[in-house]
Amino acid sequence: MRDPVSSQYSSFLFWRMPIPELDLSELEGLGLSDSPTYKSKESNSIGKMGGQATGAERKSPEGDPLLEYSTFNFWRAPIASIRSIDLDLL
């Protein structure tokens, strides 16, 4: 059986850097403080995951200023445009 003291110090959770606290003044500077995107763990019910929201809690896509950066289409490489002249050459 492993020694519980040595296994405590060999775990990833012990040695990883702590997650920094969120500075609300930085959010105010970005204009995001008045619209909370995620709820804290205490406000979620037991059956829900932290990032999920019900239909009534979801914001409209037009109201989310960061939606364009979180979509697949923003981060993928653009599709190369092919002109009809190029197709004729093939």
Swiss-Prot record:
Please verify whether the record's keywords include Phosphoprotein. yes
Please state where this protein is localized: Nucleus; Cytoplasm; Cytoplasm, Cytoskeleton, Microtubule organizing center, Centrosome
Task: List Phosphoserine occurrences by residue.
Answer: S60, S84
Q: What cellular component terms from Gene Ontology apply here?
A: centrosome; cytoplasm; cytosol; nucleoplasm
Q: Taxonomically, which superkingdom?
A: Eukaryota
- Post-translation changes: Ubiquitinated, leading to degradation.
Supply the alphabetized keyword list: Cytoplasm, Cytoskeleton, Nucleus, Phosphoprotein, Ubl conjugation
Keyword Phosphoprotein included in the entry's annotation: yes
Region (Disordered) residue ranges read 33-63
Q: Name one Pfam family in it.
A: WRNPLPNID
Residue interval(s) of motif Nuclear export signal: 24-32
Primary residence: nucleus
Which biological process annotations from GO are given for this protein? Answer: extrinsic apoptotic signaling pathway; intrinsic apoptotic signaling pathway; positive regulation of apoptotic process; positive regulation of DNA-templated transcription; positive regulation of mitochondrial depolarization; positive regulation of release of cytochrome c from mitochondria
Residue spans making up a coiled coil are none
Q: Which PANTHER family match?
A: PROTEIN AF1Q
Per the record, the similarity remark reads: Belongs to the MLLT11 family.
- Function in brief: Cofactor for the transcription factor TCF7. Involved in regulation of lymphoid development by driving multipotent hematopoietic progenitor cells towards a T-cell fate.
Q: How does it assemble?
A: Interacts with HSPA8 and LAMP2 isoform A; the interaction may target MLLT11 for degradation via chaperone-mediated autophagy. Interacts with TCF7.
What is the name of the protein in this document? Answer: Protein AF1q
Q: Which gene encodes it?
A: Mllt11
